[in-house]
Amino acid sequence: MVMNSGKWFKADEFKCNCGKCGLNTVHPELIKILDRARDHLGTPLRINSGVRCGPQHTDYNGQIGGAKNSMHLPQGDDLIGFGVDITYSQSAKRSPLNMTRLWMALEDAGRPIKLGLGLYPSWIHVDVRGLLGRGEARWQDKYFPWPR
């Protein structure tokens, strides 16, 4: 399996959390976006969830209630993931204002690729769905407290 890493993120951070399947590769364009966002923010970020195995392995994605068409699931012959969930390494930085800043940094870093961006109270989902010919998508968790 091809290992991948960037300036700030290493292959081990993208591995499936099932601990059994060995999947750990995400699209290199996604890693570039994450690195650019990290450079912009100037603070450490952490991958909560990288590639996730599906029914062909231990079905970690299904076990955690992930979408059947999740961008975390391996795509193509290379079995690479196209999405990750990311947050700040320091929990004190996970305020609504900072989560919004992370969202904006990812959106800027991803141009011109059509991204999927999901805003949650303590993490952001980001994927490079445009590389699969899909349109961009934006959503927010109903519990996200917009900064005032």
Q: Predicted segment positions?
A:
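Helix N-cap and loop-to-helix transition residues
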Residues: 10, 27, 53, 95-98
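Catalytic cores and adjacent binding grooves of peptidoglycan-active enzymes
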Residues: 68-84, 88-148
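Solvent-exposed, flexible loop/coil residues
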Residues: 13, 18, 55, 64, ...
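Compositionally biased, low-complexity repeat tracts
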Residues: 2, 15, 46, 58-62, ...
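Short amphipathic alpha-helical surface micro-motifs
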Residues: 28-30, 60-63, 106-111
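Extended, low-complexity, intrinsically disordered C-terminal regulatory tails
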Residues: 31-66
